Amino acid sequence: MPEYFIFFVLLIAALSHAICHSLLKHNNNPLGLLGITSLCEILIFTPLVFYVPLPTPYLWSLIILSALLHGLYRMLVLYSYRFGDLSFVYPISRGGSSLLLAIISTIYLTDKISLFGFLAILIICFGLFLISYSKKNKFNRIGFILALLTALMIASYTLVDGIGIRQSENAYTYLYWMLLLNGTPALIASLMFKNIGLRKINKDLLIKGISFGILAP
């Protein structure tokens, strides 16, 4: 597959991800939005799991761990956007996770990054952190801590998913089951409260939730 095509796909994925987070931030019922998104993921990936082999017990453990980490990540995102602006939280969480992954991959995994590659990652992450910096606004300590915790969750589930894909005889087995189940914690949370979540939805939330669910995977 040509490298430019992979690069183009990654750009589209990044744009879709940014749109999803913008929808999440500027919504008065973000938990409901996540609940609808989780339902969309279930509807999309349930038919697909019938076309792949069942996961092994070891893969099941990784899939369950990934689902829990994704659940924590999504809840942290909600709280992060409650205490911090999108322009503050998003660059820190994304830049921080990239830096963590680069460090962990270099030290503990077989993936080796060249010195120039590592410096490039540092420069990009530094640029992302600068986007969040503002002289006008007081430093948002709570938002910063939540953004860092979000970055930790992103790095954690990315590592788990990377291991799962590599340990699968059929990579789609892990991928489809992971995408089917990773929204279940958020779905459960969205059903637990009376005044927010899936118990309080309207047409506008439904449309945005379906759009989110299509873009998110």
Give the role of each language-model region.
Residues 73-74, 101, 157-158, 216:
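Functionally critical, cavity-lining and gating residues within the transmembrane helices
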Residues 1-68, 74-86, 133-148, 179-217:
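Membrane-interface interhelical linkers
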Residues 28-33, 77-94, 110-112, 116, ...:
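Structural motif at transmembrane-helix junctions in multi-pass transporters
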Residues 94-101:
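Glycine-rich segments within core transmembrane alpha-helices of 12-TM secondary carriers
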Residues 142-166, 170-173:
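Selected transmembrane alpha-helices and immediately adjacent juxtamembrane segments
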Residues 1-7, 44, 48-61, 101-117, ...:
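Helix-coil boundary and interhelical linker segments in multi-pass alpha-helical membrane proteins
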Residues 39, 45, 102-106, 115-133, ...:
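Hydrophobic transmembrane alpha-helices of multi-pass small-molecule transport proteins
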